[in-house]
Every structure is written in structure tokens, then in C-alpha cells.
């Protein structure tokens, strides 16, 4: 059995994906500083975090583990965020993770982050991670995978990094299953029978204008300057039967037959980018947002709606983790198990 430790655990995207996979694995440690995430994690997995700040962890006091997992904070490296990298305290979590790797020398390192991590600071940030792993005896493999090819109705590209300790795996290479099946559209994942969350009244007139006019040009000067940046993504999109994403810069429209773009929270507040169904004039409900992220309907959120949405938007996508762990199982079976 593979013993694994999870850092920056969030609400358990890694935990859930690993549990669903063929990998014979047991969690021996998990860490997360967010109290709200801990409540959600505990009620779903009957387990408490080590909730101390990751920078306060003494690596030599951690239990031994074969695999280290982390979906470390993406905001410092994200194009949607400020991209401050190591100037953001959350970005320096990467240094701590490398420190733990050096101390514990797990056989497998498994990380997830935004694709922009690879390009951040002209590639220097990512090169630091690769060099650190190489210098400590690891072979590093990575792949950008989009969740919409894994049965999730959301286009959520992420870079997945797997490193093998050479002294354990020798010349074995990680092969990611890159599923190029049809992307998953959103329409069949909507839950029309569930409760509805009305949109804010201040947006009603904007949505009305948007659906009554034929083109963006027809309405661009009818909206305030801060809402003029309108983008109709799908050329065949029916504005009376689509999904809107209300952003600080304006409104974007997407076809329900396509995957929804990356679900995220705004830097200015938890609900600013919650998707809106044009036909029903409502936000997506929590059941639908769980489906967008690949979480099961029975997954419980014992926290406020705002916190629930934020937790989902920051989560790791379990179906992709499950697929990668199945790939890992094919290699690790007979070596670690």
C-alpha cells in the first residue's frame, strides 16, 4: 500500500480522486490552514487536518510517506490573479514544499497548478521547481490536461506534475492518459428541479438588454463604461438559452452545449463570477457547481454558500486526479505495492 501525504489540501480534491482510483493508497497526513475548508473536509472524510501554517511544519517530525501531493496556491502564478509569484506569500509555499521533499524524499511527488506556472516569470519559477527536483534525484514529467476531456462540463486546463525518485523507479517514465474524447458540454449537467438562486437586481436590466439585442454593438453604449467589455464567445450562441459569466469587466456569454470556461472566484469577492443561466435568470446552484468541478452530489458543504463556492473554485478536479492515479498505478504496481 502506498502511504501518501497531502499538503494545501483544500476540500480534498486529491483525496477524492485517489480514493476513486485503482491506486492502493492510504493517507497518513494532510495539512490545510483554512478553517472553513477543514469543516468541509472533516464532514466528508471524517478526518481532521493538521491545521498549522505550512511554514510552521517541521519536516523531520512528519510521518514517512511514499507519495506527496499538493495543489499549492495558484493565485500567485495565475493570469487571472495578480501574478506576483514569490512576491506573494502564497507563492513561497513552493519553497516550503521543496524543503519537505528534500527532508522526506518520497518516491513520488504529485503537484497540480495553473498552466501559467510554466510560463511565469519567463519560465524561471517553473525551472526552479524542475531543477530542485532533478538535483534531489527525481525524474520529472508534466502534462497540461483539460478537465472537459474527463467527463467534467468545464474547461479547466491545469498542469499536472509527477516526479519519480530515480533510486526507486529507475528509468520508468510517467505516461499520462490524454483523453481526446468529445469535450463535455454543460447542458446535461443542469439541475432544473433544484432550488434557484436569483441574480442580483442590478444585473437584471443588463441581462435583459443583452438577450433582446442582436449584437454586442447594439447594446455597448447602453451599459455603464465598466460593463461595456462584452464578449459573445460562441458564434452560434442563443442569448436566450445560454450561460453568462458576469465579470468585473463585463458580461461574457457561452453556449450550454460547450464546456463552461474555468470556474473561478473574483479577487474582489466570492460571488462576482458565479455563472448565470440567461433563460432562468438565476445563478447556478450548488449542486450544479459541484458537477462543474467533478465532485459528487453527496459531497456536503457545512459552510456558507459564499464559502462553498470559493472552496469549489479553488479545488483540484477529482476526475483528473483519478485518471492520473490510474496511470500511476500501472507503473507503481510491483514497485511500491
Task: Give residue ranges: language-model regions.
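Conserved proline-anchored active-site loop of SAM-dependent methyltransferases
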Residues: 4-13, 18, 54, 64-81, ...
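A short, Lys/Arg-enriched amphipathic alpha-helix followed by its capping loop at the start of a domain
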Residues: 17-26, 44
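The conserved SAM/SAH-binding core of class I Rossmann-like methyltransferase domains
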Residues: 31
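Conserved SAM/SAH-binding beta-strand->alpha-helix loop
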Residues: 34
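Conserved SAM-binding loop
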Residues: 41
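Conserved SAM-binding strand-loop segment of SAM-dependent methyltransferases
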Residues: 47-53
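Class I S-adenosyl-L-methionine
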Residues: 57-67, 77-255
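C-terminal target-recognition/interaction regions appended to catalytic cores
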Residues: 210-337
Amino acid at each position: 500500500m502506498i502511504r501518501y501525504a497531502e499538503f494545501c489540501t483544500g476540500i480534498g480534491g486529491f483525496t477524492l480522486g485517489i480514493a476513486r482510483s485503482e491506486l492502493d493508497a492510504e493517507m497518513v497526513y494532510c495539512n490545510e490552514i483554512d478553517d472553513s475548508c477543514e469543516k468541509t473536509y472533516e464532514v466528508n472524510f471524517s478526518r481532521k487536518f493538521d491545521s498549522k501554517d505550512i511554514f510552521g511544519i517541521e519536516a523531520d517530525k512528519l510521518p514517512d510517506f511514499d507519495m506527496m501531493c499538493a495543489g499549492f496556491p495558484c493565485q500567485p502564478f495565475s493570469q487571472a490573479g495578480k501574478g506576483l509569484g514569490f512576491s506573494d506569500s502564497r507563492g513561497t509555499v513552493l519553497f516550503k514544499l521543496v524543503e519537505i521533499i528534500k527532508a522526506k524524499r518520497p518516491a513520488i511527488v504529485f503537484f497540480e497548478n495553473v498552466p501559467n506556472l510554466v510560463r511565469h516569470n519567463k519560465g524561471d519559477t517553473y525551472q526552479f521547481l524542475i531543477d530542485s527536483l532533478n538535483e534531489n534525484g527525481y525524474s520529472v514529467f508534466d502534462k497540461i490536461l483539460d478537465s472537459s476531456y474527463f467527463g467534467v462540463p468545464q474547461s479547466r486546463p491545469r498542469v499536472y506534475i509527477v516526479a519519480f525518485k530515480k533510486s526507486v523507479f529507475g528509468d520508468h517514465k510517467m505516461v499520462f492518459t490524454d483523453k481526446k474524447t468529445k469535450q463535455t458540454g454543460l447542458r446535461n449537467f443542469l439541475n432544473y428541479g433544484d432550488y434557484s438562486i436569483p441574480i442580483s437586481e442590478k444585473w437584471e436590466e443588463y441581462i435583459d438588454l443583452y438577450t433582446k439585442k442582436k449584437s454586442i454593438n447594439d447594446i455597448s453604449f447602453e451599459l455603464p463604461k465598466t460593463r461595456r467589455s462584452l464578449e459573445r464567445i460562441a458564434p452560434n450562441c442563443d442569448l436566450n438559452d445560454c450561460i453568462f459569466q458576469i465579470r468585473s469587466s463585463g458580461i461574457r456569454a457561452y453556449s450550454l452545449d460547450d464546456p463552461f470556461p474555468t470556474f473561478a472566484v473574483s479577487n474582489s469577492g466570492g460571488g462576482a463570477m458565479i455563472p448565470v443561466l440567461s433563460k432562468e435568470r438565476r445563478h447556478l446552484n450548488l449542486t450544479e457547481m459541484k458537477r462543474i468541478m467533478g465532485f459528487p452530489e453527496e459531497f456536503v458543504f457545512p459552510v456558507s454558500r459564499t464559502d462553498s463556492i470559493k472552496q469549489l473554485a479553488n479545488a483540484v478536479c477529482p476526475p483528473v486526479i483519478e485518471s492520473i492515479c490510474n496511470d500511476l498505478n500501472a507503473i507503481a504496481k510491483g514497485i511500491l505495492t
